[in-house]
Amino acid sequence: MTAAALASLYGLNIDQIEYAAEIAMEHNLGLTCDPVKGLVQIPCIERNAVAAMRAISSVNLSRFLFSTRKISFDEVVATMYRTGKDMDEKYRETSHGGLAQIYYAN
């Protein structure tokens, strides 16, 4: 949504705004939520900082590539939902998988 807000602030048209949101969201599909020691510092807060930079890049891409787009924002949202449903429960903010598991193993 940050990408869409930035695109709007930059005066892009509605198609470019939607495309900015689509680009930003599609590059976050399938991310695990595996907080180390049950805290949100790693990886969540760091991930938000990276996502903010990605939002800026998404706006720039949407400005120049919107006429070539193939996937809609709605398709990305539906895919994110399906991906989340398919994801193993241990990667859903439980600290039982991913980075959290590696940290406790060391």
Please place each PLM-identified region on the residue numbering.
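Functionally critical mobile loop/hinge segments
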Residues: 4-106
